[in-house]
Structures are given as C-alpha cells and as structure tokens.
C-alpha cells in the first residue's frame, strides 16, 4: 500500500477488533480501495494487529471495489452486520455513490452491492458530484445514515437517509432521503464545510457526533489539499415529534 491511508474506523465484531480503512496502491496512490485489520486481543491499544487484506466482495459480485472506494463503515441490525461505503462510477468526471451490502464475515460481503444514494440534489454537486463518508446511528426503531456531499470546501455538508429497523435494509425503497442537508456551513459561527462524521457516546452513554469542519472561508488552491480542517464534537439530541437526530451547533 501507499502513503495514502484514509478514513480509519474501529469496530468490535464477533469478539474481535477491526479497523476498516482505505489505502492506495504502492504504484498508484490514487488507486484507493478498502482494507481490514484484525486484533483478537482484549485491548486494541496494546494488542497485535493482522492485515486481512482488501475487503472481499460476494462471490457473484463483479463490481464492488473495482473503482475508487473508501469511507467504509459497519453497523449491526437484527443480528446482521452491514457494510456501507463510497465508490466512484463512470468515466471522466466521476460520481461518488453510497453502496450497502450484508457481511458474511468481518472482511467479506455476503451480498451483491446495493446502491443506496447518488448525488441527486444541487447541494450534493458543488465542485464534484459526491456522496461519501457514511455513518450510522440507531434510535427508537429507526436507523439514521448520515453522509457527506459535494467537494471538501465550504460547500461540504451532511445529508441523511432513514430506514425502519424492521425493513429490508438491502432494498433501496426502505430508505428515505432528506431533501435538504442536515448540517452545513454556518458563517455566523465561523464553521465551514462540516462533514465526514462518526457517532460515539460520552462517559455517560450520551450520543456524540465527531466531525471535521473548517474555521476559515477562504481556501487557497484545491480544497482537497488544504489542511484547514479541524476535528469537532457535537451533542446529539432527538426531535420530540419525529425521533430523528437533531444536529445543532449550539450543542
């Protein structure tokens, strides 16, 4: 692999620790594909990690991970594990979509990829047509899948899909996509281009969102290469009527 190692996530599955990340080829740093590390020890900070290689696709799947693929996340529902990732399609100015598959093992898919969302709206098409950086939070019978859209400048923002926990999560019709972003630039607070979030909990078990954003509106050159992105935290509350997560800079 190359020096391009991106978007690691730590997950605990079936009694072992796993890191899901994306990496480039040593001969082509932009040949980004998803990989897996495994640790069988109780403490992942001092345990031994083993490379499991590139994430495996289902035997009958000819398409997953053939192109630029990254930002994988994993979640569990009703005893099944699911893998969600971003992958580019097309030629020339490619489109980045989100796909989902059920997992056979922590490092191989059981099912053929299913398209979850493409950049349909104008706010997902600024600079580049992008849906990437999926993250999942589960609450009150619903599964909320957030993602990031557009280029990584000040137009970068977060969208969201929602599904019922009892629905077929591999059926695109089970998911409802928000028409507008759920979190975007707030000039009054000096926060620009929020995105690529993850969910965790604080010491008391309250949900927390970790994300990155910029503190300056002016960007010199290509936003992808501009280092002014900072890690930030946000408390998650739930809408009293709908039960959906509320993303507010006040928290």
What are these regions (language model features)?
Residues 1-251:
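Carbohydrate-active catalytic/glycan-binding domains of CAZyme proteins
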